[in-house]
Regions:
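Glycine-rich phosphate-binding loop of ATP-grasp-fold ATP-dependent ligases
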Residues: 4-9
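PLP-dependent aminotransferase class I/II
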Residues: 12-175
């Protein structure tokens, strides 16, 4: 769900909720008039209109999750007929399918897939560029990031919502 400001955090852990509220409301030490911060905090307060939007969407959360899950299963079934790996939840975890991804065999396969899908009306994109490759972080220390680079060259984010019938455009292709 979205509230127009990036979403919301939901938990059934009271301690985690208290901690999250503290960090997201500037980490200010309680005091009647002084502003003292004892750690790095953020100003992520949610305006009432955004909160109302979030509350309305919460009433439909199960519906949203069912739609995302159905599409993820359609992707997984479609992709299962290929040699591409669909990224799935690990162990006993349950994915929300906000972002689906696949792993291709090479950078060349990734680029070919991106070109094919985007030119056929399904927007796909490579995973985010590594932070160490962004100008503002290029001089920061890293350990070579071998695994991250391997993934960057192969992982594609696929849509978590597509128009009905859009996946049928992609019949089996000749290898």
């Amino acid at each position: 769900i979205t509230t127009g400001g990036g979403g919301m955090l939901i938990t059934d852990d009271r301690n985690l909720a208290i901690r999250a509220k503290y960090i997201t409301t500037t980490a200010k030490v309680a005091h009647p008039y002084e502003f003292v911060h004892d750690e790095i905090g953020y100003n992520y307060r949610m305006p009432n209109l955004n909160a109302a939007l979030g509350c309305a969407q919460m009433e439909r959360l199960e519906e949203f999750l069912a739609i995302k899950t159905k599409l993820a299963h359609q992707w997984a079934t479609f992709i299962d007929e290929t040699d591409v790996d669909f990224v799935k939840a690990i162990g006993g975890n349950q994915a929300n399918h906000w972002l689906n991804a696949i792993v291709l065999d090479s950078l060349e396969d990734r680029n070919e897939f991106l070109e094919y899908t985007n030119s056929n009306g399904v927007m796909t994109r490579p995973i985010w560029k590594l932070m160490s490759e962004l100008d503002m972080f290029k001089n920061c220390q890293n350990d070579g990031l071998i695994n991250s680079i391997w993934l960057q060259d192969r992982v594609v984010n696929i849509p978590s919502s597509v128009p009905d019938g859009a996946l049928s455009k992609f019949g089996k292709r000749e290898s």
